[in-house]
Amino acid sequence: MPAWFLSIMLTIMLVTGGVAAPRQVSEQAAGTYPIPVLMYHHFSQNVDEALASRMIILGDNFEEQMRFLREQGFTSLTYNDYLAVLDGEEPMPARPVLITIDDGYESNYTIAYPVLKKYGLKASIAVVVSSIPDIYGKNFPGYPHMSWAQMQEMEGSGLVEFHNHTFNLHRDVNGKPALVARLDGEGEEAFKYRVRGDLIQARRLLEEHFQKPPNALSFPYGAWDQAVMEAAIDTGHRVFPTYRWGYADGNSPVLPRILIDDIPIAEFVQIVEGKTRQGKNP
C-alpha cells in the first residue's frame, strides 16, 4: 500500500467538522519544504472589480507574482506532478510551488493563461463541470466560464491540467456546502451514493475531453468529511486540495492552500519563501 494512502487514512481519522487537523510542517529534504500551494479563482483587468472580492486578482498583479517565481528559480508542479512525487516516481524538485485555480472562469483562459505561457509556468485548474457553457448551452452573466475548446487548448500546451471541482455540488443546500449537506431524511449510504454519482459524472466528462481522468478533487468551500473522502477515493481521486490555510509537506495528498489576491509583492514573497507560518483564508 502506498505511503500516501496510509497518510490519507490517518488524516481522515483526524477529521473534525470537515476540516483536517493541523499537521506539523516538515523541514526536510534539503530545504525544499514547506511547499506553497497557491490558490486563485477569478482574474480581472478592472481595479474596482478586483477590490470587491478576495477571490479576484488583477491580471497585472498575477503577472508580477508569476514573474517573481520564474526569476527566482521556482519549479511549478501540477497536481499530477505532486502525485508522482508522492508515489516515489519523481524526486521533489528544488523550490517547488503549486499554482492552483478553482471554478473554471473564462478569465483563467483570457488573463491567466497568457501569463503562464509567457513565463513557462504550470498550473492546475479544478472545474465545476456543470458550469461549462457547452453543458447546458448557456453561460453565467458577469462571470463567464471556459468552454471545452478553450480548456483543450490550454491542456494541449502542456502547462495546464484540469481536475474535478464536482459536477454540480459547488452551492449551498440547507445552509451548508452541498458536498457535505445531507438532504432531509437522507441516510449515509444514500448520501454517499449521491455524492459518488456527482463525482463520477464530472470525472467521466473530464476524461472524455482530455483523454485522461482527473486525479485531484478540490472540495468546494473546502468542505469535506469522512463520507465525502471515502466517496472521493472510491471514484478514483488521489489528491485533495482544501481551503485550509497552510503549506503542503510533500508527504500527504491532502493539500492545505493559501489564497492569493492583490497582496503586496513583498507579502507574496514571504509566502512563497515559506516565511509566513500563520494565516487564515477568508
Residue ranges of model-derived segments:
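Sec-dependent N-terminal signal peptides of Gram-positive bacterial secreted proteins and lipoproteins
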Residues: P2-P22
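N-terminal pre-catalytic segment of deacetylase/amide-hydrolase enzymes
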Residues: G17-V97, R244, P253, R257-I260, ...
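Extracellular/periplasmic catalytic domains that process cell-envelope and extracellular macromolecules
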Residues: A29-P34, E90-P93, K117-G120, M154-S157, ...
